[in-house]
């Protein structure tokens, strides 16, 4: 008698397993589609079903679970692609900024080579002021006659050139 009950229970469990496989096929779900984490969750779900003596899986929940996991995977891929694009944009900006810095450093070095020290500039200014003052002093000492006409000098030069 005990043997018969056990055999009936085994047959019942085999029919239940076949029923679940058929329901998974109806949902177009293969167990190979799931990751290890998903399979662990399904194992846990099966344990709860056996503990609670639930013998019918609602396919809608299983489909929702599968779709949610698939959507999550697609969103993660999309996020990864967006982050790669953003990283490329940032890297190209960094590269462009680096080129600009190198160009500005070359310009700065060239400008520093051409730079005249302040002491030299002050000496040149002092020398120019001294020369200007000397020329002004010479001009003051130069006596120009009052009847001097520049036009008559120009005419004489022109006549000499013509001869």
From Swiss-Prot:
GO terms for cellular component: cytoplasm; HAUS complex; meiotic spindle; microtubule; protein-containing complex; spindle; spindle pole. The keyword Cytoplasm applies. In adult females, detected only in the abdomen with no expression in the head or thorax (at protein level). Residues 86-115 form a coiled coil. GO terms for molecular function: microtubule binding. Its main location: cytoplasm. Keywords: Cell cycle, Cell division, Coiled coil, Cytoplasm, Cytoskeleton, Meiosis, Microtubule, Mitosis. As part of the augmin complex, plays a role in centrosome-independent generation of spindle microtubules. The complex is required for mitotic spindle assembly through its involvement in localizing gamma-tubulin to spindle microtubules. wac is dispensable for somatic mitosis and for assembly of spindle microtubules in oocytes during female meiosis but is required during female meiosis for chromosome alignment and segregation. It is required for microtubule assembly near spindle poles in oocytes. This is Augmin complex subunit wac. It comes from Drosophila melanogaster.
